[in-house]
Amino acid sequence: MCKYAKMSLFVLLIVGATFFAYYNHVAFGPHFSLSKTNFKRLPYWEYDDQSQALLAFQKSCVDILKREPSAAFSTLPQSKSNQAWQTICLAANKLSHSDKMTAQQFFESWFEPYTVQDNFNPHGLFTGYYLPLLHASLKKSKQYTVPVYGLPADLVKVNLSLFGSDFSNKIIIGQLKNNTLVPYPDRTAINSGTLGKNANVLVWADNAVDVFFAQIQGSVTVQLPDHQSLLLGYASTNGRAYTAIGKVLIQNKVIAKENISMQTIRAWLQGHPEQVNDILNQNASYVFFTVLHTQDPLGMEQVPLTAQRSLAVDTHYIPLGVPVWLKTKIPEQRPVERLLPYHRLLIAQDTGGAIKGIIRGDIYWGAGEDAAFAAGHMKQIGRYWLLLPK
């Protein structure tokens, strides 16, 4: 989704984010270590139905098959060349309607697992994100007054890596004024109408809080009054620094840190409508959207995400397209609120502003109330193993 997730919901509400371009340039160094293991040592490997993971991997293959065959897949020594992955993808694409056993045999035949460690520590933080629902209209009215903007015509992105290796993975965003690149307007200015005709309004929403949370997620399903729907995806940010409103509310001592979640923040904002604009404007960062013509939101590979099979990672360490065996715990709301063990094969398909670190992941939960609950409450320690070509 290229969310703030992307873009961890929990962490973004409390900490913040920075945006980077996607490259499979992995910072393989003294703190990042990989050690080969075997599938028998992956906890509960044999119990997962990996047919859904195979479908997600086939989506990543759409991107992988477009890459230059002779180039390295990433700077990870064990990841081999694009050609090696393309051979695997061609084999994967021959498998249609695969069952659990066939999918498991596929991954075991083509890959071998590697334990990931950060300075000899295999554990890290795992969170979640989801696809929210936004009630909106194509026309402005008394009910629908909050604009959801498309990409402004005057927004300029500069890829600094084109100017030298010192600026690798750095992008700045602004606008030209008198032949000088200056920062793009912040959230306060945008909400005051400064964009004018530079940005099209894609839809008009009925709730500023819902628009704000849609920006955090990076994609949103729009429910129109005639019951038709649109899928909006991330187009760009305004380039301004991100300030987490959860952190603001904690500092203002209106919500205790241990109680912070998407749900508690939303409830507080709904209970204090007179303070909504002031709180939201504390975050200068603003997200612009584009209309997607796909059934599911797109990840950084520009392929559709799969609920509970797509993982946002830090591409400084984990290349996109890599299968990842994850062990952690997840929140469940029904029948009672509790934590459940979670062992599942996912595919690294997305990135996020809050997803930073060697062992760090953000599970895409899909849409609906249960997905919203999981994404809003998930903040668990876990570990993962990379599946790399034999």
Residue map of PLM features:
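Positively charged n-region of N-terminal signal peptides that target proteins for export
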Residues: 1-6
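Secretory/export targeting leaders with adjacent low-complexity proregions
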Residues: 33-292, 301-303
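Hydrophobic membrane-insertion alpha-helices, especially the h-region
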Residues: 8-22
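Compositionally biased, intrinsically disordered low-complexity segments
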Residues: 14-17, 149, 333
